[in-house]
Every structure is written in C-alpha cells, then in structure tokens.
C-alpha cells in the first residue's frame, strides 16, 4: 500500500491547494490524512484539531474536502454529555482502495476518449496553451489559436497513440493491482 499512499498524499495536497489556494491548507490536509491513517481509528474534529494544532474551522474544511473526495469516512453519533451530534472521521485502507479505483477509472476514461479522438479525426494543437482542436474547429479559427492567435500545429496521431497506449496499459495494471488488494 505504501507506494500508493504517497500518490494519494500528493494528490490530496495538490487538490486542496487548487481548491483553496493556500499552501498551508495543503500541508494541513496531508497532516490530517497522515494522522487519520496512522491512528487507524475514528476521531472527532475536536480531537484532530488538538493533534494537528490548527484552528477548528480549517480542520473541518479539510475534513469536508476529504469526504467530498470520497477519501474519508464519517460517522455521526449523539453525544449525551455534550448534548450534540458529533462526527467521527476515519480513513481506512478500503477508503483508499476505493478512492484509487475511482481515480484510476476516471483517468482511464479520459485516456480512452483521447485515443478515440486521435484515431477518428485529425487533431491540431496550440504550441503555447496546448489546447487541442479538431479539423473542423481548426478550419473555423483559420488554423490559429483563438486565445493567443498562434498558428496551430498538426499532430501525428501515431506518436501520441503509442505513448497513450503505454499509459493506458500501465494504468490498467495499476487498477488490477489496486482491485486485487495487492497494493
């Protein structure tokens, strides 16, 4: 599981960085991920706040983001002593496995669509912004990028299909490894 755990850590950091635009929240997300994973038990947000040493609002934001990524599990329980509902958060190996399967599946779908597009229609690409255009779109824009007016370049699909085929094979192998539980 260890090599995949590092991939998940990097993904969590980048996703939080993109979503919230704050490097500190990215580091907090990794700290929360590591804490929940290493402890192997469900913890309330208050307990996590005291462990990681950040304010409760940021910890709750990160926990909610991890939950939205389908990486963290939450259980709600009524605490009679406090008189309120408390949420206990956890990250289990099965959560990580499910997360990886969903993520790899999404990437495989995108690679498949791109390979299909490359085999069915000529593709032109802008060398500056790397946006792809079909033959019809390139013709409509007079073979110039509509964003920066750079001349579009025709790409040889055989070169890209070879690379994408290798990427697809590697992803399928990774998916098989994760699905079998031999991660």
From Swiss-Prot:
Give the quaternary structure. Answer: Monomer. Interaction with RNA polymerase subunits RpoF and RpoE is necessary for Tfe stimulatory transcription activity. Able to interact with Tbp and RNA polymerase in the absence of DNA promoter. Interacts both with the preinitiation and elongation complexes.
Which function does this protein serve? Answer: Transcription factor that plays a role in the activation of archaeal genes transcribed by RNA polymerase. Facilitates transcription initiation by enhancing TATA-box recognition by TATA-box-binding protein (Tbp), and transcription factor B (Tfb) and RNA polymerase recruitment. Not absolutely required for transcription in vitro, but particularly important in cases where Tbp or Tfb function is not optimal. It dynamically alters the nucleic acid-binding properties of RNA polymerases by stabilizing the initiation complex and destabilizing elongation complexes.
GO terms (BP aspect)? regulation of DNA-templated transcription; transcription initiation at RNA polymerase II promoter
Gene responsible for this protein: tfe
Q: Which GO molecular function annotation, any one, does this entry have?
A: DNA binding
- The HTH TFE/IIEalpha-type domain covers 4-97
Q: Which UniProt keywords apply?
A: DNA-binding, Transcription, Transcription regulation
Q: What is this protein called?
A: Transcription factor E
InterPro entries with a match to the protein in the record: TF_E_archaea, TFIIE/TFIIEa_HTH, TFIIE_asu, TFIIEa/SarR/Rpc3_HTH_dom, WH-like_DNA-bd_sf, WH_DNA-bd_sf
Q: Identify its protein family.
A: Belongs to the TFE family.
Domain notes from UniProt: The winged helix domain is involved in binding to DNA in the preinitiation complex.
């Amino acid at each position: 599981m260890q090599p995949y755990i590092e991939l998940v850590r990097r993904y969590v950091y980048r996703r939080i960085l993109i979503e919230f635009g704050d490097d500190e929240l990215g580091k907090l997300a990794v700290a929360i991920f590591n804490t929940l994973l290493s402890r192997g038990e469900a913890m309330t947000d208050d307990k996590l706040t005291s462990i990681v040493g950040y304010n409760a609002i940021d910890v709750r934001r990160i926990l909610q983001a991890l939950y939205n990524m389908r990486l963290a599990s939450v259980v709600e329980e009524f605490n009679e002593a406090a008189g309120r509902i408390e949420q206990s958060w956890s990250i289990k190996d099965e959560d990580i496995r499910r997360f990886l399967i969903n993520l790899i599946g999404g990437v495989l779908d995108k690679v498949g669509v791109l390979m299909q597009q490359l085999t069915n229609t000529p593709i032109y690409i802008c060398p500056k912004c790397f946006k792809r255009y079909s033959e019809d779109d390139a013709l409509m824009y007079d073979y110039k990028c509509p964003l920066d007016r750079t001349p579009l370049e025709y790409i040889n699909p055989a070169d890209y299909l070879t690379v994408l085929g290798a990427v697809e094979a590697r992803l399928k192998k990774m998916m098989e490894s994760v699905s079998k539980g031999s991660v």
